Structures are given as structure tokens and as C-alpha cells.
């Protein structure tokens, strides 16, 4: 099972200008290598059979005939191969020459994609030799003894995907042909190019491909000629680039004197999910113009079992490398802006936050502090309330106190033990029975205290619960589940950790930094069960519901793309290959789906809070799900894995 992935390649072969025999040999060699690696579709550079820099030689009959003979040789020598190949060559149609991409498979020409926009400025003179697809009067051409479709509007359909083609300058047009092709069904765009180099041009090219890939919600495979093309006036660096919905998957080395084969896998299921979600894409389909695409059916008859070469980030909510700092700053700024508007609108005089010494309440407090600073309000009007209970440890208690002191906010300490003991007596609950009643009573007592203090001080209770907890329902209904404004509600646990660490290292004095970093290293726990005999945290959340890094991974692919459990399981086994075994992943995947469905009733009445990333479970916005939906089909698929 390929789980919606299509393996593609951008080839950058050696070339000799006007030496079709040499070029065909190099093309055949790379096709064979790609076939051996399980590639399903491969694209070569523009005019790959002749070379792009032939100039006025394109008017020579012998070169045009040699090109067709070269194509015939490729057809004969790849007749037994399942791979679809896209090669570039001049094609004669009614005494005109077309700059063409010829699509071939198993000895047959499937179709000829014609270049629409012929550059005729600066170093380019293509209109001197070629005719645009816009001037074609026929929709078929004779090539290698076959009558085949020709045009700029061809779509090639397989059971795995539908793809279209544009050629070099087409991408640079105001409305590229790929836009129309995508709107009519193309999920992958292949571009064969002869893109010469200039200072700053490569960065612009990558930006252009990224944007077009994102705008079309498509995969984009780009192959441009390299070593061997004439350097009389320009230089070609051999750019091979593969993008998926704006993100770079693979790229070639520039200015490399060796042949290159750039391989990756396009996730067509992901593209389809994005298009389903993005209703603007569907609305745009009415604007495809009068020239409708011509569909050409083919198939990957002998497709091998897919082996992925692309990687998957085990923490999809957390950017890698230099982007992390920028991402953290942006997330923090969104939280601050959301809370600032709500404080101004409600004219709240205080912000009330329950401080446990854990990650979530720490992040919420940091947001409050920076919001008050932004609004020019005194930090003393932030009321940090620590409420020790039966499971509170010295470590979390001391961290809570130290953090509040270092930030200069007002501190209130109210033990919940006496109130809970009285409550247990009132409802006739044995204090030695540490069940759900025992735990939830403490959470609700804390929420009641915070709400009453907010009323007492004309304030607002700022919620601390994060996206991961809310997805799993790991919150007490009408306890920590409830607040007057939740600043962490769309931030997953894996990102909360990095946010707190980022603030510690970039915006805190040494005392506050030390406390924050210790909080980052503290085991995640609601501390509702008494500590162990050594005073350490006994109730560890990840021992009970599973690792948050796994649940965040499941959550991302379930909500963001609507993937089925089997595909999420497949991807998780790749992403966490050296961390968790298959049975562990399966166990917690089942837990995730069971809890996600069972706990929707808590998400149906969430307090307001800002959307920060691409995923939110606000019942008023991104996620509208009935509280009594059945999880049967999801759990059954996991059971069958």
C-alpha cells in the first residue's frame, strides 16, 4: 500500500549540444536508474534530446529528424519499463516547430505538452525558432508513427494521481498554464526548463516554484539543464527541485559537473485533503477559461512497493533550525495580542492565573506578564494563585513561588486541602479512595477559587489548558477545562515546552531563567494524587495517556489532513523509528482516537481563545463535531493493523 504517495524524479543528465545520440543514451541511463529506485514519473530538462542551446540549428531538418529518431530509440529501449518519462524535444506540427515535452511509457507516446509562453527578450529568442501552443490549430500530431494528443492543456490520469506539464517560461507568466491544469485536476505539475543563472535569480526561482506549488495546492517537479549546455553567453546550473504545497522536499546541487537524479515522494492524499478543506480552491474551478483540459488515461502497471526517501518531522508543530526562534516569537505575539484585546474590551482590572509550577500555567503567566507590559499596566495587577493540594510536590510548589516572585506579580497562596476534605465529607466520599471524584474535586475547587477571586477583583481568569490536553480530554470538565479566556488552547504540548524555553533564554534574568528551565525539565502531571514516599511526582500524565510527542503527531495528521489511522500509523513508524516500537505506537494511537471521540463534549463548550497555528479545536471555528459521534470505524482500522 502506497498511502497516497507518488515517487517522482527530476533528472539532470549530461548533454552535448546537437548530439542526439549521446543525449538519448544519457536519458536512457537515468530512466533505468530511476526505474530501479521505484520512481513512477521522471522529468528531464527542456530540449533534453537535442540540448537547449542549439540556436538556429533548430531550423535544420537533420537535427529535427535526429531528435525524432532519438525519441524512437528511447521508446524501443524502455518498452518493458513501467515508469512514465517526460523528455524535451522539438516537434514538427504542420511545418511549425513546437517546444515540446513528450510523455512516454512502455514504448508509447501518451501525449505532447506544448510550451505556451516563448520568451523573446534579453538573452532569449525562442520565437525565432518555435511556435506557441496558443497558435496550434490541431489537437493531435504524428510522432514516431503514432497519432498523439498535443497541446498545453493535457492532463495525464492514473489511478494514483493526475498530472500536468508546463515548460520553463510558462511558470513565469502572469497566469501560468499550471494554474488552469491544477484547477482541472492536476495534482502534480512537471516543469522541464532551461533556466540560466544570474545573481539572485536562483532565490527568485525557488520562491516562484514554492508560491505556485502552494497556490495550486500541488506537487511541483522542476528539472533544468546543467553541465554540457553551451556557455557562449549564459550558464546553466542544473536545478532539480521538488516541492509539495509550498514546501521543499528535495533539491539538486547547483553547478555540479556530475549527472543528478533528484527523487522524492509527493503525498497526493495530502494534496487532496488540502483541496477539500480549502473551499476557495473549489470556487476557483469555475474560472478555468474556455479551453478545457484533455484527459489521457494511463497506469502504473507494475508499480513496486513504495519506499519513502523523504523524511517526516516527529514534532510537526515545532519548526526545525533557525525557524524555531521566529516561530516562537510569532506564536507568543499572537497570544499577547489576543489577551490584550480581551482585557481592553472587558475593562478587566486584573488577570487571575492559577500557577501550578507546570508548563501550561507557566506559559499562560508569561503571556499575561508580556501583555500587561504591552498595555502599560502594572504587573501587580496580575494575580498569581498557587493552590497546593494533596499531590503538590516541593519542586512544583517552589518553582511556582520563585517564578511569580521573579516576575514581580501579586502572589496568593490558598491551600485546597481543607476545602476538599470538607467537600468529601459533604458528598460522603472516602478520602482514601483516589478515584476520579477525588481528582476532579480538586480541579474544580481550584477553578472555583480563581473565578471567585476574579469576581472579587473585577478581573478575568486566564485559562492554561493546551491543545494536546483538550484533544485528549485530559482536563476536568468545568474544572481546569474552564476559564474566561484561554491563551494556550491552540498550542500543542510539544510546542509549549519550546515556547517556555525560548522565553527563558531570550527575555529573562538569570533567576527567572533558572526557574523556567527547571519547569521545562519537570515531569508533566496534574498532581492530583499524593506524591510517592520520596516526595516525588507519582502521577505522571504520559504514563497514563501516552507520550505527548506521539499524540501531537497523531493530532497533526488527523486534524490537519484527515488521514486515516493506518496512514498515521505508517508515518509514525517512520518518524519515531528509533524511539518507539510498532506495538507502542499502535497502543497509543488507539488511545488517541478513543479519547478524542469520547471527550468531544468538553471541546463543545470551550472558552474563547486565539487561534495560533494551522490547527484549532474551537467549536466556533475550525472543529465542529458532534459530541456523540462513534469512533468505531477508526478503532476497527487500528485493531486490524
Stretches found by the model and what they are:
Residues 7, 23, 159, 216-218, ...:
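ATP/NTP-dependent adenylation/nucleotidyl-transfer catalytic domains that generate, transfer
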Residues 1-352, 370-379, 411:
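Enzyme catalytic cores with a strong preference for nitrogen-chemistry domains
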Amino acid at each position: 500500500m502506497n498511502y497516497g504517495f507518488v515517487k517522482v524524479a527530476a533528472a539532470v543528465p549530461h548533454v552535448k549540444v546537437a548530439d542526439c545520440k549521446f543525449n538519448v543514451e544519457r536519458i536512457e541511463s537515468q530512466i533505468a536508474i530511476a526505474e530501479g529506485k521505484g520512481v513512477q514519473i521522471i522529468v528531464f530538462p527542456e530540449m533534453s534530446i537535442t540540448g537547449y542551446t542549439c540556436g538556429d540549428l533548430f531550423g535544420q531538418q537533420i537535427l529535427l529528424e535526429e531528435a525524432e529518431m532519438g525519441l524512437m530509440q528511447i521508446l524501443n529501449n524502455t518498452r518493458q519499463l513501467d515508469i512514465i518519462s517526460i523528455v524535451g524535444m522539438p516537434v514538427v506540427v504542420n511545418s511549425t516547430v513546437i517546444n515540446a515535452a513528450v510523455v512516454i511509457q512502455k514504448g508509447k507516446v501518451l501525449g505532447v505538452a506544448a510550451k505556451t509562453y516563448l520568451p523573446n527578450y534579453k538573452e532569449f529568442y525562442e520565437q525565432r525558432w518555435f511556435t506557441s501552443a496558443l497558435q496550434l490549430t490541431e489537437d493531435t500530431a504524428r510522432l514516431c508513427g503514432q497519432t498523439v494528443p498535443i497541446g498545453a492543456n493535457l492532463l495525464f490520469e492514473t489511478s494514483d494521481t493526475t498530472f500536468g506539464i508546463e515548460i520553463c517560461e510558462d511558470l513565469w507568466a502572469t497566469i501560468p498554464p499550471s494554474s488552469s491544469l491544477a484547477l482541472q485536476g492536476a495534482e502534480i505539475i512537471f516543469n522541464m526548463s532551461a533556466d540560466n543563472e544570474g545573481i539572485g535569480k536562483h532565490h527568485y526561482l525557488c520562491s516562484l516554484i514554492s508560491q505556485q506549488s502552494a497556490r495550486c495546492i500541488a506537487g511541483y517537479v522542476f528539472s533544468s539543464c546543467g553541465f554540457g549546455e553551451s556557455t557562449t553567453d549564459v550558464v546553466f546550473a542544473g536545478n532539480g527541485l521538488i516541492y509539495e504545497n509550498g514546501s521543499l522536499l528535495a533539491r539538486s546541487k547547483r553547478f555540479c559537473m556530475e549527472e543528478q537524479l533528484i527523487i522524492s515522494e509527493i503525498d497526493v492524499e495530502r494534496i487532496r485533503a488540502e483541496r477539500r478543506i480549502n473551499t476557495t480552491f473549489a470556487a476557483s474551478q469555475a474560472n478555468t477559461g474556455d479551453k478545457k483540459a484533455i484527459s489521457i488515461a494511463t497506469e502504473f502497471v507494475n508499480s513496486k512497493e513504495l519506499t519513502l526517501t523523504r523524511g517526516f518531522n516527529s514534532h510537526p508543530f515545532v519548526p526545525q533550525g533557525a525557524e524555531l526562534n521566529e516561530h516562537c516569537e510569532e506564536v507568543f505575539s499572537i497570544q499577547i495580542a489576543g489577551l490584550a484585546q480581551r482585557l481592553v474590551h472587558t475593562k478587566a482590572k486584573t488577570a487571575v492565573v492559577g500557577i501550578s509550577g507546570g508548563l501550561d500555567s507557566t506559559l499562560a503567566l508569561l503571556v499575561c506578564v508580556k501583555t500587561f507590559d504591552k498595555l502599560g499596566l502594572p504587573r501587580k495587577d496580575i494575580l498569581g494563585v498557587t493552590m497546593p493540594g494533596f499531590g503538590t510536590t516541593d519542586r512544583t510548589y517552589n518553582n511556582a513561588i520563585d517564578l511569580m516572585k521573579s516576575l514581580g506579580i501579586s502572589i496568593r497562596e490558598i491551600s485546597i486541602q481543607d476545602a476538599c476534605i470538607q467537600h468529601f465529607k459533604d458528598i460522603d466520599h472516602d478520602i482514601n479512595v483516589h478515584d476520579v471524584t477525588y481528582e476532579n474535586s480538586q480541579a474544580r475547587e481550584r477553578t472555583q477559587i480563581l473565578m471567585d477571586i476574579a469576581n472579587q477583583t473585577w478581573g478575568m481568569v486566564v485559562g492554561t489548558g493546551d491543545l494536546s490536553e483538550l484533544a485528549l480530554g485530559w482536563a476536568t470538565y468545568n474544572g481546569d477545562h474552564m476559564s474566561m479566556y484561554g491563551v494556550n488552547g491552540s498550542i500543542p504540548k510539544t510546542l509549549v515546552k519550546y515556547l517556555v524555553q525560548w522565553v527563558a533564554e531570550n527575555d529573562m534574568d538569570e533567576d527567572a531563567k533558572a526557574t523556567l528551565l527547571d519547569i521545562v525539565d519537570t515531569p508533566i502531571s496534574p498532581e492530583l494524587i499524593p506524591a510517592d514516599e520520596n516526595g516525588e511526582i507519582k502521577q505522571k500524565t504520559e504514563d497514563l495517556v501516552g507520550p505527548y510527542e506521539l499524540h501531537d503527531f497523531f493530532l497533526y495528521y488527523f486534524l490537519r489532513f484527515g488521514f486515516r489511522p493506518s496512514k498515521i500509523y505508517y508515518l509514525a513508524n517512520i518518524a519515531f523509528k528509533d524511539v518507539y516500537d510498532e506495538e507502542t505506537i499502535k497502543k497509543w494511537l488507539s488511545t488517541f482516537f478513543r479519547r478524542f471521540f469520547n471527550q468531544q463534549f468538553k471541546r463543545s463548550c470551550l472558552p474563547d481563545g486565539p487561534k495560533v497555528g494551522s490547527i484549532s479545536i474551537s467549536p466556533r471555528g475550525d472543529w465542529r463535531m458532534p459530541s456523540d459521534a462513534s469512533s468505531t470505524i477508526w478503532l476497527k482500522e487500528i485493531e486490524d493493523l
